[in-house]
From Swiss-Prot:
Its EC number is 2.7.7.3. It is an enzyme of class 2 (transferase). The gene is coaD. ATP binds at S9, F10, H17, G88, L89, R90, E98, Y124, T125, Y126, V127, S128, S129, T130. It comes from Fusobacterium nucleatum subsp. nucleatum (strain ATCC 25586 / DSM 15643 / BCRC 10681 / CIP 101130 / JCM 8532 / KCTC 2640 / LMG 13131 / VPI 4355). It catalyses: (R)-4'-phosphopantetheine + ATP + H(+) = 3'-dephospho-CoA + diphosphate. Reversibly transfers an adenylyl group from ATP to 4'-phosphopantetheine, yielding dephospho-CoA (dPCoA) and pyrophosphate. Keywords: ATP-binding, Coenzyme A biosynthesis, Cytoplasm, Magnesium, Nucleotide-binding, Nucleotidyltransferase, Transferase. The lineage of its organism: Bacteria, Fusobacteriati, Fusobacteriota, Fusobacteriia, Fusobacteriales. One of its GO terms (molecular function) is ATP binding. GO terms for biological process: coenzyme A biosynthetic process. This is Phosphopantetheine adenylyltransferase. The record marks H17 as: Transition state stabilizer.
Length: 163
């Protein structure tokens, strides 16, 4: 069984992330979506909330597991016997950054981790979690940018931020 890992902060998960997850399942048999905390980011949703948003979207899927990890991703992958890392790419900037990480992950894992890059579908190239949060903050429609199952959660959080 081929098990892949798709990691990110997912604050919140977008249709772009969802598209990468669904397309990754054409490559691997099982995908572990790993929610990570980046110490340089300020989050709208805490770790458990982000995991719950993802779980809500993929509820009932036997092919997707949602997990969390603090630390090096290669350590999580070794612990879970995974060697396929899935990365979505929106543009050349993403490619440049992720290519560097792929070399580092390969070295840190003693050659065990291979990174598979999946280009973002054209309709999601400009969609990011930051973009979604900005739309939500200004009470704009999130339809088409996030799954319908999580729109209310995101709009409610935006309302809290607006005060």
């Amino acid at each position: 069984m081929k098990i892949g890992v798709y990691a990110g902060s997912f604050d919140p998960i977008t249709k772009g992330h969802q598209d990468i997850i669904e397309r990754a399942l054409k490559i691997v048999d099982k995908l572990i979506v790993v929610v990570m905390n980046n110490p340089t980011k300020n989050y709208w949703f805490n770790l458990d909330e982000r995991k719950n948003l993802i779980s809500k979207i993929f509820e009932g899927s036997d092919s997707i597991k949602v997990d969390e990890h603090a630390g090096l991703l290669v350590d999580f992958m070794a612990k879970n016997s995974c060697n396929i890392l899935i990365k979505g790419l929106r543009d050349v900037k993403d490619f440049s950054e992720e290519m560097t990480y792929s070399f580092a992950n390969k070295k840190l894992s003693n050659g065990e981790v291979d990174t598979i890059f999946i280009p973002t579908s054209e309709k999601y190239t400009y969609v990011s979690s930051t973009f979604v949060k900005e739309l939500a903050f200004y009470n704009q429609s999130l339809t088409g940018y996030v799954d319908d199952k999580v729109i209310v959660d995101i709009l409610n959080r935006a309302k809290e931020y607006r005060g």
